[in-house]
Regions:
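Bacterial Sec-dependent N-terminal signal peptides
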Residues: 1-22
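Feature for soluble, non-membrane regions of globular proteins
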Residues: 17-212
């Protein structure tokens, strides 16, 4: 009888612990679609390991802890970003932003977009080269930490937006298309204070098939 009781207790305890773990791990660190050294020399292996493996992991852990027991506990990431503020928004925003950022690159990237995106860029800026210059300028002139975005409104009209800290254009009703990270942890190991060089180099690894 005691053995059965202890077995039942262990089962209940383990299920309870599994449930707690499941809640804590609601959001998980995304797997990179390339090796950690695949984007060199544009982004070094060391930067990827710190940026993805440590910085992003911390945001994921923080977010999971912050949303437990709140109305966001079962919400998807975009909903949390749109409806939250404070620490929850900051960490959710950083998780969403980094998920988009890390998956838009490829060691076989570069070149130019094609199709509808290429046409929309030409309509908005006259040429792809003009668009590149404007996005680089936006990223270089953004004061402090943040993100520079190519985004589209509900009619498909493109714009470049600068968002401080964890900002994302979805909070303005826009659809994110492409983003460059201008937090120092994204480039300082490789480019030190040369943010402009970092932004210019990123074009070499943008996977336009993913972006489009």
């Amino acid at each position: 009888m005691i053995t059965i009781f202890l077995s039942l207790f262990a089962l209940i305890f383990n299920n309870s612990e599994a449930s707690k773990t499941e809640k804590v791990m609601k959001f998980e660190l995304i797997q990179l679609p390339y090796a950690s050294d695949a984007l060199e020399p544009v982004i070094s292996k060391q930067t990827i390991e710190f940026h993805h493996g440590k910085h992003l992991q911390t945001y994921v852990n923080n977010l999971n802890n912050l949303i437990q027991g709140t109305k966001f506990e079962n919400a998807d990431l975009e909903t949390i970003v749109k409806e939250s503020d404070g620490a929850v928004f900051n960490n959710a925003g950083q998780v969403l932003n980094h998920n988009l950022y890390f998956t838009e690159f490829s060691p076989k990237g570069g070149g130019k977009p094609t199709g509808k995106l290429a046409k929309a860029i030409d309509e908005a800026w006259g040429s792809f080269e003009n668009f590149q210059k404007e996005l680089e300028t936006a990223g270089t002139t953004l004061f402090g930490s943040g993100w520079v975005w190519l985004a589209a409104d509900k009619d498909g009209k493109l714009s470049i937006t600068k968002e401080s800290n964890a900002g994302n254009p979805i909070t303005k009703g826009l659809k994110p298309i492409l983003t460059f990270d201008v937090w120092e942890h994204a480039y300082y190991l490789d480019y030190q204070n040369r943010r402009a060089d970092h932004l210019k180099a990123l074009w070499k690894i943008v996977d336009w098939q993913v972006v489009e």
